[in-house]
């Protein structure tokens, strides 16, 4: 099946990224997770490795030393699809403005434009409604990203509203559409 680069940023919804990685691997996709440094403080990259059977990464320079190369370039050339779930407001802003300060953002920036990209935001409803976040999301869509809309409901921060990470089955359906897979 396909080679999927799964980017994950620090969010209370990070547990869903683990479930998503597992489900994609069970469908015979090759899933390599790249976590932001803050996400790696919440969930161990080794968990993603156990769920997918593929290496998971967090730090470009540590990995580059071990592999003898530029990890962000090898990841970008490997990927047939990029999925970012969860995408926090911070990560959305960095991607919208082309800022590459960690392995995840540098790898994504180096992915060829022909590779489909899915963005799955997860954040507090007030953050999602902020004009700057809305502009950043609109910019990414204009740049060719496909948005998997966040759901509504009770948030980890205690409020109700739109901002929950889409459920793994919804994201998997978006993956199928992006890869043009038929049942």
Predicted regions and their residues:
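A cross-family phosphate/adenosyl-ligand binding-site feature
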Residues: 1-119, 124-183
